[in-house]
């Protein structure tokens, strides 16, 4: 009986590690939100007030994170953490005072790149 229990424990723990390696399936809701994220990053206007723009973008990315985590697609949830950090740093800098156009443009390009990577990963699933 102890052998059977040991075999069952090993088999079940092996299955759980295999399941972590299998990518999650395509999801229409995630595809919509990542397209919104791409669009929002492309439309950041460095000449306008950045706080509301960054707040809206942060809210979208946070929605994606909550949805992916709640749904259990942890492979997709890991993707947004870097983008959330970038947005938070950008928000903190915008709150501290005026931002140079070059800094804003560089952060915008980074956010566009991060949104594109997330979108390609999310929409490239089947």
Residue ranges with predicted function:
Residues 1-7:
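Sec-dependent signal peptide recognition
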Residues 107-126:
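Short, low-complexity, Pro/Ser/Thr/Gly-rich segments in the mature regions of secreted, periplasmic
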């Amino acid at each position: 009986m102890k052998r059977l229990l040991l075999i069952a424990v090993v088999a079940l723990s092996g299955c759980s590690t295999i399941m972590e390696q299998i990518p999650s399936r395509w999801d229409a809701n995630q595809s919509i939100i990542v397209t919104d994220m791409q669009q929002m990053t492309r439309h950041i206007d460095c000449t306008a007030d950045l706080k509301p723009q960054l707040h809206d973008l942060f809210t979208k990315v946070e929605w994606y994170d909550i949805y992916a985590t709640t749904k259990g697609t942890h492979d997709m949830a890991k993707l947004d953490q870097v983008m959330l950090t970038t947005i938070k740093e950008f928000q903190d800098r915008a709150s501290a005072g005026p931002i140079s156009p070059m800094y804003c443009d560089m952060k915008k390009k980074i956010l566009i790149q991060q949104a594109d990577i997330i979108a390609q990963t999310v929409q490239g699933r089947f």
